Regions:
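Helicase-associated low-complexity/disordered flanking segments
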Residues: 1-51, 208, 300-337, 597
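Non-catalytic terminal extensions of ATP-dependent helicases
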Residues: 337, 341, 360-364, 445, ...
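Walker A/P-loop NTP-binding motif
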Residues: 43-51, 61-77, 161-166
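SF2 helicase catalytic motif II
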Residues: 125-127, 134-174
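Conserved segment of the helicase C-terminal RecA-like domain
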Residues: 379, 383-393, 398-440
Length: 808
């Protein structure tokens, strides 16, 4: 169906009457009135002002972005819609194609390029960041930054800051953020960096949320009442549940929350489904589904079960790759047919999408999901269960943040359907209620900058700005430096306080002792203490000092030491300060003054580090590039320009490999296998398959060894210049990549024999590898002899189930 909106002249901006018509036409698209915060944000957009909207999950932030799209199309201009995740970009692309027509919408995600000249272009933040540096979009009017709170993400936050810094000042920004503590600070930084921006903060949820706690036995209570009185008992135990099941699925439960099979019947009986059940591991999600299918009843009546069969049949026709060949796929299909699903990043994209569709239609009542489902995927529920307050991280287990709880809990409560959403938090110890109450009483955490200078960022800055002061100005426009300036102001204020206290301490004068006299007394007393420590049995001597005493006695008589101690004591007693009643307070003031001076010096050093930290970081990164000859006289060589064009965390090692000859003479499938060593290492693989592959492929084993030498050199140079950037080198994907790129057709057999992990992980690894290969092919600085090799590598990978998953 053709998309129609009132036309607006882009030349001078829409007149007031047209603004009114445009807004009224937009209102007619929705069966409900706009909320006041949406109206406020829309009026800023109509006035051409940038806006940042902070509101809870499900409050309707996306509607503000949809108006920006509506207005952009009316003005016949272009809009870039950025998301932090490829899956979210794919979802937005599909949504916008349905709303506005595929002719108006395009997508750029690195491995996928569809309709790149469209007026509405969905893309990841990395893509738009690079476009701003190298090839700005023509006629770009607006940039939407969806999930803007991702600016605080450890791995991806830098890109968000770079995008805002490099965005042309003539482009309107529409930023959408979850509720965070420092939205005003973020808005102030954007205002200083890009231009005036108006913050619209709406903390109220459209559907009220009740947070409850569930103990290890399945008793649900209010946050205030949990653990303080007898909680409400569960209304029924799942059929077949026995004490031996407790032992099998959780031991004595000292550190385990209630098992899902115990809680789900309670949720069903209370009418709190559909439910998103968050479990912080893939294996935990799969075990929960498997155990429920063993013991729990179906959650579907016959009519709903028939609808599920119809949707599954349709999905199998569209995506034949999701047939239940693997053990996980078979488990998922069994669950869907009984109204229970699972959702995590290791699943096939098409199978995840099928689960989402069934959940949205109310045909799946419970989905066991990892927390990735809380990041923008549209799956509103009646209730949310968070299984425990602790999750595993790289450094061990840690407590959830308030932002994480808010993000997950925010999925509960469907607008226009539920009067109230329910967020049930599982307690994993009998004493967990107090910990939960303390955590839930905290405000949302502030967004902290994760800005860092990588090799690609440094190369792009050198390509774009020739003048070092300009580069420094751009770097110090970062949110990280903005927050550093706040810390510097705090340090300056603290130094001022310390200086005042130090002056007061220095100003104290003893009525009888002058400072030089007191200092001579203290010096003599210190000498006396050292001599006393040499005497046997001195209580103040340490173990090391006592060992030193024993050695000294063999060289010097004990009598000599005692004689010196006696003489020093007598001399000290004759000094005027020895019996002075004012000496103690004077010494205390003097000691306090010295400590204050040391503290001020520490604050001064910290301030200096904050003032130049990012610029120093940039200089060190450029020094590494210069060491390898990728920067000469302040200009990039072809190798450096190639690095600048890569959206990849391993960009330096990739460039070293490309220009070292590591890929010379290889076929496309072999080049793909070797390039896979430079991508992110997968979570779980069949290590034996990789070893067997390398034993059989001696020439690739030698190429890998050459990469290991290059990696060792990079590590040594980074250590020398104090550049703590990580890089990756592994062989885990080589066997699967080589076989698939060479034309292997048996996907299930490939996953089982050459990979050993989750199918979804392998799909994602191949999509990333395709993206990296295309970046190399598109680079004008790639050696021409390698271009056809990487073209063949990409073509061999981008087919079958891997291609089918590109836009899911």
């Amino acid at each position: 169906m053709a998309f129609h909106i009132p036309e607006v002249s882009p030349a001078a901006g829409p007149p007031a009457r047209t603004d009114f018509d445009l807004l009224e036409a937009f209102r007619q698209r929705y069966p409900f009135p706009l909320d006041p915060f949406q109206e406020e944000a829309i009026r800023h957009i109509l006035a051409g002002r940038s806006v940042i909207v902070s509101a809870p999950t499900g409050a309707g932030k996306t509607l503000v972005a949809e108006f920006a799209i509506y207005r952009t199309l009316a003005a016949q201009r272009r809009l870039a819609y950025t998301t932090p995740l490829k899956a979210l970009s794919n979802q937005k692309y599909a949504d916008f194609c349905r709303q506005y027509g595929p002719e108006f919408v395009g997508i750029l995600t690195g491995d996928v390029k569809v309709n790149p000249r469209a007026p509405i272009l969905v893309m990841t933040t990395e893509i738009l960041r690079n476009l701003f540096y190298t090839d700005p979009m023509e006629d770009l009017a607006t940039v939407v930054l969806d999930e803007c709170h991702y600016m605080g993400d450890e791995g991806r936050g830098t890109v968000w800051e770079e995008l805002i810094i490099t965005c042309p000042k003539t482009v309107q920004l529409v930023a959408l953020s979850a509720t965070v503590q420092n939205i005003a600070e973020i808005a102030d930084w954007i205002g200083q960096t890009h231009g005036p921006i108006h913050a619209v903060h709406h903390p109220v949820r459209p559907v009220p949320l009740q947070t409850l706690l569930c103990d290890q036995e399945g008793r649900i209570a209010t946050v205030e009442g949990a653990g303080r009185r007898a909680a409400e008992p569960p209304r029924g135990r799942p059929h077949g549940w026995r004490d031996r099941d407790r032992r099998r699925h959780g031991g004595d439960f000292r550190r385990r929350p209630v098992h899902p099979s115990r809680l789900i019947p309670e949720l069903v009986e209370r009418g709190w489904v559909p439910t998103l059940y968050f479990i912080f591991s893939r294996a935990g999600c799969e075990r929960a589904l498997e155990f429920y299918l063993e013991r729990g009843p179906s959650l579907l009546d016959p009519r709903r079960a028939a609808e599920v069969e119809e949707v599954i049949a349709h999905a199998l026709r569209d995506y034949p790759s999701i047939t239940p060949e693997s053990e996980l796929n078979a488990l998922v299909f069994r669950g869907l047919r009984r109204g229970v699903g699972v959702h995590h990043a290791g699943m096939l994209p098409a199978l995840k999408r099928l689960t989402e569709v069934l959940f949205e239609r109310g045909l799946v009542k419970v989905v066991f999901a990892t927390e990735t489902m809380s990041l923008g995927i549209h799956m509103p529920a009646k209730s949310v269960v968070i299984q425990g307050l602790r999750k595993r991280s790289d450094a061990g287990f840690r407590t959830l943040t308030m932002n994480e709880i808010t993000q997950m809990g925010g999925r509960a409560g469907r607008r226009g359907i539920d009067l109230e959403g329910k967020c049930v938090i599982g307690l994993d110890t009998p004493e967990g209620a107090e910990e939960a109450r303390a955590l839930l009483a905290r405000p949302p955490e502030p967004i902290e900058s994760r800005f860092r200078i990588g090799y690609s960022s440094a190369a792009l800055l050198l390509m774009t700005y020739k003048d070092p002061p300009m580069i420094r100005s751009v770097i110090e426009s970062s949110f990280g430096q903005y927050q550093n300036r706040r810390r510097i102001r705090e340090l300056e204020a603290r130094r001022g306080e310390l200086a005042l206290r130090q002056a007061q301490a220095e100003g104290f004068q003893s009525p009888c002792c002058e400072l030089p006299t007191l200092m001579r007394y203290r010096s003599q007393r210190a000498i006396l203490e050292r001599e006393r420590q040499r005497l046997p049995g001195f209580s103040g001597a340490s173990r090391r000092q006592r060992k030193a005493q024993a050695a000294a006695w063999s060289l010097e008589s004990l009598a000599d030491v005692r004689e010196r101690v006696t003489a020093l004591e007598a001399a000290l007693a004759q000094m005027p300060c020895h019996r002075c009643p004012h000496r103690g307070p004077y010494e205390a003031r003097l000691k306090r003054s010295r400590k204050l001076v040391e503290a001020m010096e520490g604050h001064r050093r910290a301030q200096e580090e904050l003032e130049g930290s990012y610029w120093e970081q940039f200089l060190r990164v450029v020094a590494v590039l210069g060491h390898f000859g990728y920067v000469k006289d302040g200009a990039l060589t072809p190798e450096g320009r190639l690095i600048g064009g890569l959206r990849h965390d391993n960009e330096l090692l990739v460039a070293r490999a490309v220009f070292s000859g590591a890929f010379d003479g290889l076929k496309g499938s072999e080049a793909a296998a070797l390039l896979s060593c430079l991508t992110e290492e997968p979570r779980e693989t069949a290590r034996d398959a990789a070893k067997a592959f390398l034993r059989a492929q001696g020439h690739l084993r030698r190429r890998l060894q050459s990469l290991e030498l290059l990696a060792g050199e990079v590590e040594r140079v980074q250590d020398r210049y104090k550049v703590p950037l990580s890089f990756s080198l592994h062989s885990a994907l080589m066997a699967a990549t080589a076989r698939w790129a060479a034309g292997e057709e048996d996907w299930a057999g490939l996953v089982d024999s050459a990979y050993g992990g989750h199918e979804g992980d392998l799909i994602r690894a191949f999509r990333r590898l395709i993206d990296l290969g295309r970046q190399l092919v598109d680079s004008p600085d790639l050696p021409e002899r390698l271009r056809p090799v990487f073209v063949d590598a990409v073509a061999g990978l981008d087919r079958g189930i891997v291609l089918e998953s590109a836009l899911i």
